[in-house]
Swiss-Prot record:
GO BP: any one term: cellular response to starvation
Functional description taken from the UniProt entry: Inhibits RpoS proteolysis by regulating RssB activity, thereby increasing the stability of the sigma stress factor RpoS during magnesium starvation.
Protein source organism: Escherichia coli O7:K1 (strain IAI39 / ExPEC)
Keywords assigned by UniProt, alphabetized: Cytoplasm, Stress response
GO-annotated cellular components: cytoplasm
InterPro entries listed in its UniProt record: Anti-adapter_IraM, PmrD_sf
Subcellular location: Cytoplasm
Protein family: Belongs to the IraM/RssC family.
NCBIfam families from the UniProt entry: PRK09919.1
Superkingdom per UniProt: Bacteria
Name of the protein described by the UniProt record: Anti-adapter protein IraM
Amino acid sequence: MKWIVIDTVIQPTCGISFSAIWGDMKMIIWYQSTIFLPPGRIFTPVKSGIILKDKEYPITIYNIAPFNKDLWSLLKSSQECPPGESKITNKCLHNSCIIKICPYGLK
């Protein structure tokens, strides 16, 4: 079964991400991984993680729930990454970010 990423929210201080996805139905997944799942990305879940572009990546999925518009709005409003000022300076202002490669291309 293939899943399509609709949107992703990252919490850089803890490395946790939330993605709204479409599979058989619209869902929200809560996970931790070293990869970023941007909107439009298509992947296949497997027991040990996910397959993305014919390569397997480890991923820890904490929860999968049916999509809830109110919950997604709450997650989006509490999003720490990327902060608005970063778009102007192209520099990440999060001193406590644990993500090694910024998915937004910030330095």
